[in-house]
UniProtKB/Swiss-Prot annotation:
The pro-IL-18 precursor is processed by CASP1 or CASP4 to yield the active form. GO terms for cellular component: cytoplasm; extracellular space. Keywords: Cytokine, Cytoplasm, Secreted. This is Interleukin-18. It comes from Gallus gallus (Chicken). Gene3D superfamilies: 2.80.10.50. One of its GO terms (biological process) is positive regulation of lymphocyte proliferation. The lineage of its organism: Eukaryota, Metazoa, Chordata, Craniata, Vertebrata. Belongs to the IL-1 family.
Amino acid sequence: MSCEEIAVCAVRLRENLCLYFEELECDAFCKDKTIKRFFRNVNSQLLVVRPDLNVAAFEDVTDQEVKSGSGMYFDIHCYKTTAPSARMPVAFSVQVEDKSYYMCCEKEHGKMVVRFREGEVPKDIPGESNIIFFKKTFTSCSSKAFKFEYSLEQGMFLAFEEEDSLRKLILKKLPREDEVDETTKFVTSHNERHNL
C-alpha cells in the first residue's frame, strides 16, 4: 500500500449507503446474494449443461429430467461493485449430479467460447474476471427478459446458435449495444413451467 495521497471527489451517496467517487475504476467484485433460476430461450427451451460432453445447449426436456434439475437449475451469483452502474455484475454456476460447475469464457482457436469448469464461484473477485457478466434488461418494455454482456469485452453477449441440431450457448458480438437480437434474450424463472 502506498502513502501517496490521492484527491477524490465524492459524487453521491446511494440508497445502499455506499459512497461513490468520480473517475475511480472498479477494482473488485464482492458477492452480494445468490438466486436460483432456470434459463429459457425464445423457443421456451431450457438451458442444460452437460460437462461430460463439454456442451451447454437449450433443449426440450422431459418432466422427469426437469424434476432432477441436474445441469438445469442455475445459481446466479450477484456481485456488488465499487462503480455505480445500471448493470448488475453476475456469475453463474450449476450443479450436475454431485459436482458444481461455474461458467467462464476462454479463447480457443482465436475465438471466445463459453465453458463450464468444475469448482465454486469465488466470494470476492479482485479486478477483472472471465466469469463476470453484466445483467441488463433485454428491452425497456421487456422487464422479465435479460441479456448478459461479457465483462471483459464490451458488446459481447451470451446467446444461442444452431449447431448440429443443438442450440448451443455461445458468445456473440453485437455491432450496437441497443440492437435487438432474439438469440441474446434469456428469461429466468424459479419455476421450470414458466412460459414466455
